[in-house]
A protein has these predicted regions:
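Signature of short aromatic-glycine-proline-rich micro-motifs recurring in repeat-based ectodomains
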Residues: 102-106, 150-157, 208-214, 258-265, ...
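Blade-level signature of beta-propeller repeat domains, shared across WD40, Kelch, NHL, RCC1
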Residues: 755-785
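Conserved blade-ending motifs and adjacent loop-strand segments that build the rim/top face
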Residues: 361, 409-416, 465-478, 513-520, ...
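Short glycine/acidic-enriched loop and turn motifs that connect beta-strands
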Residues: 124-125, 172-177, 232-233, 286-289, ...
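Loop/turn-rich, solvent-exposed surfaces of beta-rich toroidal or solenoidal domains
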Residues: 423-437, 441-446, 670-690, 696-740
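Surface-exposed loop and turn segments in beta-propeller and other repeat-based domains
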Residues: 141-147, 197-206, 250-254, 401-419, ...
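Beta-strand-rich domains and repeat architectures in extracellular enzymes and scaffolds
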Residues: 96-124, 432
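Conserved Ser/Thr-centered positions that define the repeating blades of beta-propeller domains
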Residues: 128-130, 160, 186-187, 237-238, ...
Length: 785
């Protein structure tokens, strides 16, 4: 088997300070990213009785290190020349407060250290709890674009003997085109990480992502870890996750319809500190064959646990203080649909079915109270009435429901969830340091209570929104109106918000009337910013309509009287005076009476994306980038005329690292404050026309682009500030120009990269303010320091 290799270190996104020469170079060139040589202490090494690392080093050699150092220095020299043309403007970054807006699929408490806990998400990184700030803190904002796969976190493990050590198994998808995953290890509570690349993939955003935990630390030998994978079997590390080797004696990789190995667990009572645990269990997502295995010889051999249930997929497993093993099961790994489930308990070799309630739903999580092993809670998935949390105080003999009765909810920290049904409770945890404190996760974040034991007294349990600091939205469009609200966000799954205070959750919640799932387009008139129009698709089974508009800057909303036939999703353009709206679908439709009537637009190809000029209310455009045609309307969008154009160096080609078609690349951007002034933000370059598209010039420094936007002009300047996400002069980052793209300044640092950035927009009301929308990491806003 091929062991994993350690290769990189990060400190809040910066190269680790003990890696030469990256430490010295990073001090002088903060945007420079160098693949630093391995530390000697991190070199793969051969353990007795194991297969040698691949490639197997015969002896330590000076020459590979020298070669690596020379390459790094050459790269640094090249980057130095490029960096001389780029200024750096330090920015202060904060998250726009939406709170949650995505699936938190796992919570991990440290078993002995009070206040130490972590949260993982399916595509938005991982978080550590900060008890002083009383909020979650992102741990992976340093992840660069080239490593965006690491933003999906498959599993988290903590060292029971050291509250500062935490491990993350990172990787979003297991498909053929996605890179292999990595194990991130930290010795300071997730503030800094070192990376070990592994020769297999993780599926942080795939079916079964709420199962777990797949990775665990031996409490009696904390340098030893077990890791379950989706398709590549069981892996083990004996050096604190620096190197990994496949456990070839483990007999299963998981069923064809399952999610691989979903839980690994050591038995602390089977060993002594410093000697290691001899007994361990592994649960496999398999409903057709054996799905629970154990080893009683420190992992040398494995065998199915006698009498274990079959026919369902294990979802969670936990060991109580009394050596009782609790498991939950469903008819799928989830969050695909479940129509059956069970809860089982193994104690003293005897299996007992302790399912609280049978039905056409599954069970997905279980937690046992520290010090009281007969007290446990379990959560359901797919319950026909509403999701449920059952609680027992007698080891599963009897259960009481805790949802749908006397409980109350405090939505003040995330008002939008008041009308978002509780769903996807794939983890539920009782705080080992406080039996009154429990957390359950959801598709929008989660809830926590501080009076859980009141349920045993028949008193109401109060559940509070618990996701402050966690921001998982996928921004599909960002709008900063010329006056009024600071920002309007169009996001996936939860519609979007009108933000008047970026540092507090929106008190009225997300968009309603209509309430969208995905908002795919939002626009306002530059000269009439109180007129805001949004399009998308309603959430759930709602029939509220696929378009909403506001005439008071987003304070209130209403639906149009009519809509084009079959209209849903698409994009919306609003004329500069707010009176003409054009809805781009498979074809385009136009209204001049706020949606009472719609007429087809003529002269456009299929699947257009019409945009409005920011000055002339009768002027609209549509870009056919790959065909080299610019469609223009000067009659208020009633008819369009196409005209061919050329670009210096030729038209762009499809393909490349575009990553997500919803990003702001390959689009046309009319300039605020100037009619007939256009920018093409293509993936492979930035182009400008000052004559309505008659002629385009290419901006020479821009090599690659993912997002583009405008902001308020700098003091004394007549041109709007430009903001760009991409690569300029060989440097990848977030950039600002205040002189019409003649020069650029870098405005982000290595601690703020957010994986894949989809959208960027400046603020027309405040110079320097910029909004950055990242894939699964919400929206951040920046101001110059």
């Amino acid at each position: 088997s091929h062991p994993a290799r350690p290769d990189e270190g990060y400190r809040d996104g910066e190269p680790a300070k003990d890696l030469f020469p990256a430490d010295q170079l990073a001090d002088h060139f903060p945007r420079l990213r160098i693949a630093a040589p391995l530390k000697i202490s991190d070199q793969p090494r051969v353990a007795a009785g194991s297969r040698p690392p691949f490639p197997a080093p015969d002896q330590p050699s000076f020459y590979p290190k020298l070669r690596t150092m020379l390459i790094a220095l050459l790269l640094a020299f090249t980057a130095t020349i490029n960096a001389q043309t780029l200024k750096t403007v330090p920015y202060r970054w904060k998250s726009v407060q939406m709170v949650g807006t995505g699936f938190v699929d796992g919570i991990v408490f440290h078993p002995t250290a009070k206040g130490v806990r972590y949260a993982r998400t399916d595509m938005g990184g991982a978080y550590r709890w900060d008890p002083k700030a009383n909020r979650w803190m992102p741990m992976l904002d340093w992840v660069p674009f080239q490593d965006l796969n690491l933003m999906g976190v498959e599993s988290i493990a903590v060292d029971p003997t050291d509250p500062d050590k935490v491990y993350l198994a990172c990787g979003t998808y297991t498909n053929r085109t996605t890179p292999d995953g990595a194990i991130l290890r930290s010795s300071d509570g997730g503030r800094t990480f070192k990376i070990t690349r592994v020769p297999f993939k993780f599926g942080g955003n795939e079916n079964g992502r709420g199962n777990g935990e797949r990775m665990t630390v031996d409490p009696n030998a904390p340098q030893r870890l077990l890791l379950g994978t989706r398709h590549d079997g069981l892996w083990r590390s004996d050096d604190g996750a620096v190197t990994w080797h496949r456990v070839d004696t483990f007999p299963s990789t998981g069923g064809a319809r399952g999610a691989g190995i979903v839980v690994t667990l050591f038995d602390p009572a089977s060993g002594k500190p410093g000697q290691g645990s001899t007994h361990a269990w592994v649960a496999v997502s398999d409903a057709e064959g054996p799905n629970l295995y154990e080893s009683k010889d420190s992992g040398a051999t494995w065998a199915p646990v006698p009498g274990a249930p079959s026919g369902l997929f294990p979802t969670h497993m936990i060991l109580g203080d009394d050596e009782a093993l609790w498991l939950t099961y469903g008819s799928s790994p989830g969050p695909s649909r479940m129509n059956a489930g069970a809860v089982w308990k193994l104690k003293d070799g005897n299996w007992t079915d302790v399912t609280p309630e049978k039905g056409s739903f599954g069970y997905v999580a279980v937690s046992v109270q520290e010090g009281k092993p007969d007290t446990a809670i379990v959560s359901t998935f797919g319950h026909p009435e509403h999701e449920q949390i059952f609680r027992t105080t007698d080891g599963g003999k009897t259960w009481r429901p805790t949802i749908g009765g006397k409980e109350t909810y405090d939505y003040s920290k995330a008002p939008y969830i008041a009308h978002t049904g509780i769903h996807w409770l794939f983890d539920i945890e009782i705080d080992p340091a406080n039996p009154n404190h429990a957390i359950f996760t959801t598709g929008y974040g989660g809830h926590e209570t501080f009076n859980l034991t009141d349920a045993d007294k028949g008193k109401p349990v109060i559940w509070h929104a618990m996701a402050t600091g966690i921001e998982e939205a996928v921004p599909l469009q960002l709008l900063s109106p010329t006056k009024g609200a600071q920002l309007v966000t169009a996001i996936g799954d939860y519609g979007g918000f009108v933000h008047r205070n970026l540092d507090k959750p929106v008190p009225e919640g997300n968009f309603i009337n209509p309430h969208f799932g995905n908002t795919t387009g939002v626009a306002a008139g530059d000269q009439a910013p109180d007129t805001i129009v949004r399009v998308g698709v309603p959430s759930g089974n709602s029939r509220a309509g696929n378009i909403g508009y506001s005439l008071d800057g987003g304070k209130t909303w209403q639906t149009t009287k009519t809509a084009p036939p079959g209209a849903r999703n698409g994009h919306i353009a609003v004329s500069a005076d707010g009176k003409i709206w054009i809805w781009s679908l498979s074809s385009a439709y136009r209204t001049t009476d706020m949606g009472q009537t719609w007429t087809p637009v003529t002269g456009l190809p299929s699947n257009p994306r019409v945009v409005a000029d920011h000055v002339d209310p009768n002027l609209f455009y549509n870009l056919e980038l790959f065909g080299g045609v610019l469609d223009t309307s000067r009659d208020g969008g009633a008819t369009f005329t196409g005209k061919s154009f050329t670009l210096p160096g030729g038209l762009p080609h499809r393909g490349g690292d575009r990553m997500d078609a919803r990003a702001g690349q390959d689009q046309l951007y009319p300039t605020p404050g100037k009619a007939d002034d256009l920018w093409i933000a293509a993936f492979d370059g930035l182009y400008h026309s000052a004559d309505g598209g008659g002629n385009f010039t290419k901006l020479p420094q821009v090599e690659q682009l993912h997002a583009f936007g405008f902001g308020k002009a700098a003091p004394g300047s007549s041109v709007p500030a430009l903001y760009l996400v991409g690569t300029i002069d060989g440097v990848r980052g977030i950039f600002r120009s205040t002189d019409g793209a003649r020069s650029w300044a870098i405005i982000n640092d290595l601690a703020h990269q957010w994986g894949l950035v989809l959208q960027i927009s400046g603020d027309p009301k405040k110079f320097g303010r910029v909004y950055v929308g990242a894939h699964g990491r919400g929206v951040s806003y920046g101001d110059p320091k």
